[in-house]
Design a protein with these regions (language model features):
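Low-complexity intrinsically disordered segments
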Residues: 155-159
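Cell wall/extracellular polymer interaction/catalysis modules
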Residues: 1-154
């Protein structure tokens, strides 16, 4: 199963995106067919450094990255699995192979403060927030479990 997160609003305090599920992948041309909107997302702000330190230097240095406020994870394609989160005491999707990050989860929450560096799902009906987050998290987990049950890998592409 392919998930696509398209960032549509990059603000100082948050990033809003649209999460879509790909119904069909054209293997010959490696293109997506039948992209279906699923829900909205909320993340920390996208990283845009305006200092003498380059973005590449920060991404190479875990110490520098930890000293910054939480920021949105880099664009890319990441494997998604569901695992137990001791912090949230729940089974939640987690992204694997994110450069410089570990424990990036998709979880419930409403505001940028709730993201804790992760991705929140819901409906963006208020500025800078997502609503009905638990409902959309449940729906997403169901889709992931169904895909895994069919023997499919689950991938999230962030762009």
């Amino acid at each position: 199963m392919e998930l696509i997160l398209t960032r549509i609003a990059k603000r100082k305090a948050y990033t809003i995106g649209r999460l879509s599920i790909i119904k069909e992948v054209n293997e010959e041309y490696k293109t997506y067919e039948q992209e279906e909107y699923f829900c909205d997302t909320l993340e920390p702000p996208a990283l845009e450094l305006k200092t003498t330190v380059s973005k590449e230097a920060v991404l190479r240095s875990p110490a520098k990255a930890r000293s910054l406020k939480p920021f949105a994870i880099p664009e890319g394609r990441y494997a998604v699995v569901i695992s137990w989160s001791p912090r949230f005491r729940a089974w939640l999707p987690i992204l694997l192979g994110v450069p410089m990050f570990s424990g990036i989860r998709i979880h419930a929450g409403n505001t940028a403060k709730d993201t804790q560096g992760c991705i929140l799902v819901g409906r963006n009906q208020l500025v800078g927030q997502v609503l009905e987050s638990r409902k959309w998290l449940y729906e997403l987990k169901q889709k992931i479990v169904e895909a895994k049950g069919r023997g499919e890998s689950v991938w999230l592409t962030i762009k």
